[in-house]
Amino acid sequence: MHEQFEAIHPFLDGNGRLGRLLITLFLIERGRLPQPLLYLSAYIEAHRQDYYELLQRVRTHGDWMGWLRFFIAGVTEISLEVVGRADRLMDLREKFRTRLRDKPKALALLDELFLNPYMSVAKAERVLKVSNPTARQAVMLLQRKGMLEEITGRTWGKLYLVKPIMDTIDLKGNGK
């Protein structure tokens, strides 16, 4: 399907990104991927020359086997990376939970932070269903324990981030 989409090249811009996204959506639709965790963009970018050569060989020589080998190698490599990241995230979560064992409100915030690593005091109020001072206390505890880092530099409306989560999933927090 990806090769066919690339061959049609229906848009002036964005065909590559959309074609790679279609891979993930197709696998989800077919029940082969329960969550959108497999993105081949990094693999394709790292093997760009092979990618284009193999796409061209499908068009010129009908070399589907070469294309499929490349594609399966990419799925394998990215899948192993995703499993490694998931393992590291579970280890990080357990390490943090151990440090907060006797702090139920902070533990509840921690669970939320592993769904979305950004937190504000207002969000903590909603998540915990507590007053502003109680929410602030839970956020400050996570900050003192080195789990949250304030990223705005503001006095009011501060936003906090769990940078170790972002580092683990290899995303840059705070535009860095």
Where are the language model's segments positioned?
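Alpha-helix C-caps/helix-loop-beta hinges
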Residues: 8, 116, 145-146
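Short acidic, hydrophobic short linear motifs in intrinsically disordered regions
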Residues: 110, 115-128
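Phosphate/pyrophosphate-binding active-site loops
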Residues: 1-86, 91
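Conserved, hydrophobic alpha-helical core segments of structured domains
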Residues: 101-109, 115, 132, 156
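Basic amphipathic alpha-helical segments that dock to polyanions
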Residues: 113, 135-145
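Short, cationic-aromatic polyanion-contact patches
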Residues: 102-103, 150-174
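Short alpha-helical segments that sit at the start of domains
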Residues: 82-110
